[in-house]
Amino acid sequence: MVTGIVFHEEYLKHEQSPTHPERRERLAYTMDQLREEGIFESERIVLLEPFKASLEDVLEVHTEEYVRFLEMESKKGGIIDFDTNIPVGVFDRALLAAGGAIRAAQAVLNKECENAFAMIRPPGHHAKPYIGAGFCYLNNMAIMVKWLLKQGFERIAILDWDAHHGDGTQEIFYNDDRVLFISTHQMPLYPGTGYPEECGTGKGEGYTVNIPLPPGTGDEGYMMVIDEIIEPVVNEFKPQFIAISAGQDNHFTDPITSLALTARGYAEMMRRAVAMAEKHCDGRLVAVLEGGYSVEGALPYTNLGIIAAMAGFDLSAIREPENYLPELLWRKRDSALVKLKHNIEDVKRVHSKYWKCFK
């Protein structure tokens, strides 16, 4: 199995401030770790060069007014909200990030690789058609999925496992029955959306599946969600392409969330996603980097685990350094599983009228 990795040094130049959670070290430390592990020397890994997304592709998702605003503000610097500034030059870097997602999908379709990981920034899943938010400017995932729809795909499944609900992606596909949007996210947490009752409108009713996770949810809880919700729905939907919004802020060392996933947990989630892609879509799968702010304690190891699972490497050695593990004992809560079981039943109740697997 060959896995493509999209990366460009330009992604390291985006910076709101040196102390902002979404800073260059998120990717810089990861790339150092991947090089140290010899990932790029493997015949199973191919490095892919991104290109800038075209305005035509961006306008499939975002309004012309917002795109014009972002382009103009990017020339002098500006602000969207209290945690999302517009640094000088961000428009071109956001285009390169969105184009990186498209490049990953293109490589899979062209059979340059079986699957691909777009290691891009700035992230995108909070960006809505008319405005950016939550460190995001352009919705990379939505732009890629719209591009795939134009290639003729009729059923695409998005799995967003970022700790924060992908409200932008949800809004963009909320009334579209061609796109199954599944989100697992901590609740309560920014942006305050993603309740089970948010399940789509019009033709898209039933095609948005939100699974709130209690603080303290760890590997066992995530596997329970895959077993009881995600796999049954995906099996019934039968996607032709699977896209992963691969946020990594659900790690137990992340400074702005309260979940307890481990690097091995990420690897196992991706292994399960790859298996679903092999079952339904000839292996076609693209992961797109979203959040994740533990630049030393998590990202180098979680990204390694994700790539190892995508490329079919042995996962037995995927783990964090032992000095980080005491924080896992502090973060993980057994009570979270009890609450999660109730949440899972709520999701099944809401979606029982849409999916046979829950009847």
From Swiss-Prot:
Q: Name one GO molecular function term.
A: hydrolase activity
Cross-referenced InterPro entries: HDAC_PDAC (IPR050284), His_deacetylse (IPR000286), His_deacetylse_1 (IPR003084), His_deacetylse_dom (IPR023801), His_deacetylse_dom_sf (IPR037138), Ureohydrolase_dom_sf (IPR023696)
Entry note: cofactor: Binds 1 zinc ion per subunit.
Cofactor(s) annotated in UniProt: Zn(2+)
Family in the record: Belongs to the histone deacetylase family.
* Protein role: Probable deacetylase.
| Keywords, comma-separated and alphabetical | Hydrolase, Metal-binding, Zinc
Q: Where is this site: Polarizes the scissile carbonyl of the substrate?
A: Y293
Q: Which GO terms describe its biological process?
A: epigenetic regulation of gene expression
One Pfam family per UniProt: Hist_deacetyl
Q: Which residues are annotated as active site? A: H126 (proton donor/acceptor)
Q: What is its EC number?
A: 3.5.1.-
Question: Which positions does UniProt annotate for Zn(2+) binding?
Answer: D162, H164, D249
Its name, as the record gives it, is Probable deacetylase AF_0130
